[in-house]
Amino acid sequence: MSYNRLGESYGEDDHSHSPMMNPHQTNNRSPSPGRPLNAYQLSDVSYGPQERLHMPSSDLLAEQPTYSVERLPNSYGHNEAYEQHHQQSYPGYEYAVDPEAHHDAYYTQPYQPTVTPHDDYDLGQYPEHQHQHSYSDDRIPMLQQDNPFGPDPYSDEYQVEEQADGHTPSPAPIRRWKTVKEVQLFNGNLVLDCPIAPKLLNQVPHAEPPGRDEFTHMRYSAATCDPNDFFEERFTLRQKLFAKPRHTELFIVVTMYNEDDFLFARTLIGVFKNIEHMCSRTHSKTWGKDAWKKIVVCVISDGRAKINPRTRAVLAALGVYQDGIAKQQVNGKDVTAHIYEYTTQIALELKGTQVQIKGRSAVPVQMIFCLKEKNQKKINSHRWFFQAFGRVLDPNICVLLDAGTKPGKDSIYRLWKAFDVEPMCGGACGEIKVMLSHGKKLLNPLVAGQNFEYKLSNILDKPMESAFGFISVLPGAFSAYRFVALQNDKNGQGPLERYFLGEKMHGANAGIFTANMYLAEDRILCFEIVTKRNCRWLLQYVKSSTGETDVPDQMAEFILQRRRWLNGSFFAAVYAIAHFYQIWRSDHSAIRKFALLIEFFYQTINMLFAWFGIGNFFLVFHILTTYLGQKDLLGTTGKVLGVVFEWLYLATLVTCFVLALGNRPGGSNKFYMTMVYFWIGIMIYLAFACIFVTVKSIQTEVQQDGFTFTDLFTNSTFFTIIVSLGSTYVMWFVASIIFLDPWHMFTSFIQYILLTPTYINVLNIYAFCNTHDITWGTKGDDKAEKLPSANLKPGGKVDVDIPQDDGDLNAQYDTELAKFAEKPPKEVQVISEEERQADYYKGFRSAVVLAWVFCNFALGAVVLSAAGLDRFDQSEKTSEDSNKRSTIYMAVVLWSVAGLSIFKFIGALWYLVVRMFRGV
């Protein structure tokens, strides 16, 4: 149950740790998710083991219907003639999630393309002619244009002159001519095989003409369905179109919204380095020279209108995106996602804040780029990843990354290793580090405080939870799951079913509790995996696997981020604690179940402390400041300071509530920054109070006759303050040293301590005051530019526009490169006039409310000698004086009311007298 199962085996052969761990291992495969030492339920897979498509033993492309249609001559694909003569039914899930028959036959595939002048590693040879040996290379996912399965589906080809003002989906060079081809739609699906620009092609090894391979063409699919129907609608991916379909051991997804090219490239560079590392492990039984064939990188962008143009240009530079071929509709169906596939051999590098093309990469990388038509949030992106693409590829391990998170050079391998070592590992995560830019960002106290918080979580929280086998949250920014552990049972219930409920929990019919809970849906997924019926999956923390990410450096951004985190984690924790009994439906041992119950009890105590955090902090503040008012400490000075700070404390607390209930953090930044500075002052005063009270208590003990060191521990003040706080801080330091990671104690400890009141008061108040806000902090969908449609013609064909000319392809490629060739313009946050005016009105309202509340509070405090004013007068007459002031106040108020009533009565009588004489 250790937090790091890699230990010293890292660097050895991947399976040399224990031959007994995988008794069924064959064909150089990794441990199957269904191959633990003891069997577990296999029948809970919703798709079920079904009849597989027959594959020949050779590397020839199987005689199978495919949804690909020909884009150019030589393209791979079938036509109607084949389907008419080869009737075949298709099960609901061709590549079933069946752990007992998991990819045994598809692990070692030769990679032997033609040697070119660009080559510096062995690539073998292609046949000289296209029809020779009938595509013996497994990398060629295509059929011949005129093959035994049917004739070329093209019937006509003609050219039209494109007008200069022709509509294109995004800025592109104006083409002089565009070739229009009639393309056959199969089952209503449009799939195009698009040649890449010669400028790009000449940089990488590829098949010599007329040969074609995964390096010469990019594959585009216009998905017109929901992710859950992707397979049933007969869409597929390149990896399944080879003669011997490639097995996907690692399926890596990078989700993004509108991240810029720098953040995206930073993540992609880290992923590429990990793939290079796995290809360099030549002694491994799973990885090695051709390891890249077992790894697929999927980039999913949330909304065509939202993607950053510079980021899209980087994808085009890699060859995985081309402008101008996407369609809005196919045969009257709206396109829901544009799917681009290409195996890139282009590397990226960062120079300062600029992305540059490095040239040829060390190893190829199989990439899928899914550009969703609409902005439907991150959870929908994960639906495309798991339900659509995952169902087709049937991977072993899925790795989740956010754009901007940079994995370490071998971090993904180390995550995979955790699954390899522990067959029952259902999920794992690494250490999330704050990106500090060589320490420069530590000058920002907010960044330093978050750095300490992250470190403390990775040193104490996650290792402890990993020891029990249940980590409350595997961060979506960098985590991994075993695909089979996520699958639903035969009734459609399970981890993925519960996880994707969150997509439906943002409408009018969603309960507010459930909607808030699904702001942290990754916590729900973790709980469902560990408590999965008749299974015994565990979650693990892998400290040796790291990922770096940026954190908010502005208070407004920080508050908005933590609002979602705090609300989601709180309600998800309530859900987990309330459903702790579901642990009994799992197949864990009795000892493990007991350990998990202990962890749930620990989380309950943590949740209670979070619930009472504001009250606990105020009580500690009040008790310490009251101590300072004693005669043997600060005396009158302590009393005055205590009352002043208490009034300011309560005033700031009320201000937090008023702002949280109606103001946007970005529009009230001055208010919030003022409060942060005040809370820092409060923490400094509290630290001074702790030290001063402790020193005075020690001096008092020392001055007594017969003093011994043990007498200090009999002093309640010393024992309460020093022993409790000291043990906490010393424990942090010792744990950091044990984990060989102590530097944050020297660089970030003070900043974290000073920001503690801000964490407790500002963040918690804003979060709980905005439980009605169940958004992810992103704006609504912008209107995307309309794309051309592919309309059905007689004969089941559509017209598609194709840039045929090499000059056009090169010009388009140069245009994309130019988009990120220059340094990005400095991002300036533009606030609209409507937002500015709304912020002004809300700020004025908040100021009026605060002035009204504070004046009434001050009146009550003065009359009743409350809120600390009674500390100034310690005489015995204090009670009598207070009663006298109350009596006088009551008399003033009541007689004032009576006087006002008399005044109004006299005025009313005078009105009647005047009216009587006027007669009106």
From Swiss-Prot:
It comes from the Eukaryota. It is a multi-pass membrane protein. It is found in: Cell membrane. One of its GO terms (biological process) is ascospore wall assembly. One of its GO terms (cellular component) is chitosome. The chain crosses the membrane at residues 466-486, 564-584, 608-628, 640-660, 675-695, 718-738, 749-769, 847-867, 892-912. Pfam families: Chitin_synth_1, Chitin_synth_1N. It catalyses: [(1->4)-N-acetyl-beta-D-glucosaminyl](n) + UDP-N-acetyl-alpha-D-glucosamine = [(1->4)-N-acetyl-beta-D-glucosaminyl](n+1) + UDP + H(+). Its EC number is 2.4.1.16. Induction: Expressed during exponential growth. Glycans are attached at N715. PANTHER family: CHITIN SYNTHASE, CHITIN SYNTHASE 1. This is Chitin synthase C.
